Design a protein with these regions (language model features):
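Extracytoplasmic ligand-binding site segments that recognize negatively charged/polar headgroups
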Residues: 55-67, 82-92, 105, 109-268
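Short, polar/charged alpha-helical segment
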Residues: 37-46, 53, 57-79, 173
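Bacterial N-terminal signal peptides
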Residues: 14-26
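Periplasmic-binding protein-like
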Residues: 155-156, 169, 248-253, 263, ...
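Conserved C-terminal helix/tail region of periplasmic/extracytoplasmic solute-binding proteins
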Residues: 34-36, 272, 379-414
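Bacterial N-terminal signal peptides that target proteins for export
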Residues: 2-17
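Mature extracytoplasmic/periplasmic domains
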Residues: 312, 317-386
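A ligand-binding cleft/hinge motif common to bilobed small-molecule-binding domains
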Residues: 119-121, 282-300
Length: 414
C-alpha cells in the first residue's frame, strides 16, 4: 500500500499554484545584514517585527512566549507577534503558496515552531533559510550534538543547521499510584492490562499528535524489524511493517474506554479522564505534564509518571526561519534568545512551562548550571536518569500513513 506524504502533497499543491499563477517579479529585495559577527545582526534587527507562528493551544506556552516578547522588546527593540496556530501544516502551506506566487521576500511568517513532518516538507520544498544559520547563533555553543543527537536529526531528517533547537519532549505514561500501584511497562503488558481491565484505558484520537505518537510507540515495540521505519514510508511494504500494530489494536480496541467507540479529543482530555477516575493510565509528551497538572489541581497528588522498560519516543522541537522571512535578522535574534541559558531555564521551570532544555549542562557557566540543578522537578516528574532510555522517532512520512490507516480501520468506532 502506498501513501502520499505531506511532502508529496505539498509538491502537488505547488504544481497547481504554479500552473495557475503567472510568476511575478520578486518583491523589492530585503537588505539582509548578518555580517561577520552577531552584533551586526542585532543592530539590523532593531525595530523589526517578528511574526512567530506557533501552536496556541496551551495557556502556559502562550504566556511564556509573551514573556519572551517583552524581553526582546526591552533588550533589542524587537516586536514579537505570536500568531497562534491550530495546525502548523497550514503555515507550511502558506509559505509554499508564497513561493509559488513569486514572493521571495517580505513573507508573512518570520519564525515557525516546527519539527518532524513539517520540517521535512519545508526542507524538501526549499522553504527554509539554508545557510546553516542555527549553528552560527551565539547560544549554539551551549548545545552538544554528541550528547543529544536529535538536535541534528529531526525525525531521522538531518537538520543541516536550518532550524534551531528549542526544547525536548518524551512520551510518558501516567497512573494514579493508589489505584494502580504497578502499571504495565511494555506494549505486551499493556495489552494484557487492557484485556483484564475493560474500559480502563484509552488514547487520544489520531490525528492528535500524542495519539499518533502512542501508535508509533506500540509499533516500535511490536515490529519484527524497525529499520524500515527510519526510511521513507514509500520505500517499505507498509502492510507488512505495520501488521503488528494493527493486530495489537484489533485485540485491544473492544476493551478500551467506551468499547473503543469513542476517544478523547486530545491528551488534556485524556488527563481529565485520569483525574476523574474514568481511566487508569494517561499519556503525555512532556515529562513535567503530570506535575504541572497536580499543581493546578487537575490531578490528585498520588499520580506518578513512568515509561516503558525499553524506552519511549523522544524528540526535539525547533524554530525555523522561512526562506522569504520579512525580518530574518530579528528572527535569528529571537531564536538565539530562545536558546539562551536564561530563556531555557525559565522554559524548563514546571511552574512556567516545564519544557525540558536542549542545552548541555557541561557547556554552561557554573551559575547557569546551578540554576537548572535548582529547578523543582515536581512529585510526578521522572529524573533525567529515569528518562534516559529513549526510542528515536521514525521517518516523518510514517506519521500520516499510520494516521490514515488508523482512521480507515478504527475511525468510525472500530
Amino acid at each position: 500500500m502506498k501513501y502520499l506524504t505531506l511532502t508529496h502533497r505539498l509538491r502537488g499543491f505547488a504544481s497547481t499554484v504554479l500552473a495557475a499563477v503567472a510568476l511575478t517579479s520578486p518583491l523589492c529585495a530585503h537588505s539582509t545584514e548578518f555580517g561577520p559577527d552577531f552584533d551586526t545582526t542585532i543592530e539590523a534587527a532593531r525595530g523589526q517585527t517578528v511574526y512567530f507562528n506557533a501552536w496556541g493551544g496551551d495557556d502556559k506556552i502562550n504566556d511564556y512566549i509573551a514573556w519572551a516578547g517583552t524581553e526582546l522588546e526591552t533588550r533589542y527593540g524587537i516586536t514579537l507577534e505570536h500568531v497562534k496556530l491550530a495546525d502548523t501544516g497550514n503555515a507550511v502551506s502558506r509559505i509554499l503558496a508564497e513561493k509559488a506566487a513569486g514572493r521571495t521576500s517580505g513573507g508573512s511568517i518570520d519564525l515557525l515552531w516546527v519539527n518532524g513532518e513539517n520540517f521535512a516538507a519545508m526542507k524538501t520544498n526549499a522553504l527554509l533559510q539554508d545557510d546553516a544559520w542555527a549553528r552560527k547563533l551565539p547560544s549554539w555553543r551551549f548545545t552538544d550534538a554528541e550528547a543529544l543527537p536529535a538536535i541534528e536529526l529531526d525525525f531521522a531528517e538531518p537538520t543541516d543547521g536550518r532550524e534551531s533547537p528549542w526544547g525536548r519532549a518524551q512520551l510518558v505514561f501516567t497512573h494514579d499510584s493508589l489505584r494502580l500501584p504497578l502499571p504495565p511497562r511494555s506494549a505486551g503488558a499493556l495489552a494484557e492490562f487492557i484485556r483484564a481491565n475493560p474500559g480502563r484505558f484509552t488514547y487520544p484520537q489520531p490525528p492528535d499528535f500524542v495519539g499518533l505518537s502512542f501508535l508509533k510507540q506500540i509499533l516500535l515495540e511490536t515490529a519484527t524489524d524497525t529499520a524500515p521505519l527510519y526510511r521513507p514510508v514509500g520505500d517499505a511494504d507498509f502492510d507488512a511493517v505495520t501488521a503488528p500494530l494493527w493486530d495489537w489494536l484489533t485485540t485491544a480496541t473492544s476493551n478500551l474506554w467506551r468499547g473503543g467507540k469513542a476517544y478523547p479529543f486530545n491528551y488534556p482530555t485524556l488527563r481529565q479522564l485520569l483525574g476523574d477516575g474514568e481511566v487508569d493510565i494517561g499519556i503525555a509528551f512532556n515529562p513535567a505534564d503530570a506535575s504541572a497538572a497536580i499543581t493546578r489541581g487537575e490531578l490528585p497528588d498520588s499520580v506518578r509518571s513512568y515509561i516503558h522498560d525499553d524506552g519511549t519516543l523522544a524528540n526535539v522541537h525547533f524554530l525555523a526561519i522561512p526562506f522569504n522571512a520579512n525580518a530574518p535578522e530579528a528572527a535569528r535574534v529571537v531564536a538565539d534568545f530562545m536558546l539562551s541559558p536564561e530563556a531555557q531555564l525559565r522554559k524548563a521551570d514546571p511552574r512556567i512551562w516545564g519544557d525540558p532544555t536542549v542545552l548541555a549542562m557541561h557547556r554552561l557557566l557554573p551559575e547557569d548550571r546551578a540554576g537548572f540543578e535548582a529547578l523543582p522537578r515536581g512529585i510526578a516528574t521522572l529524573s533525567e536518569a529515569e528518562l534516559a532510555t529513549t526510542l528515536a522517532e521514525p521517518h516523518p512520512s510514517w506519521m500520516k500513513a499510520i494516521g490514515d490507516e488508523w482512521r480507515r480501520r478504527f475511525g468510525s468506532g472500530g
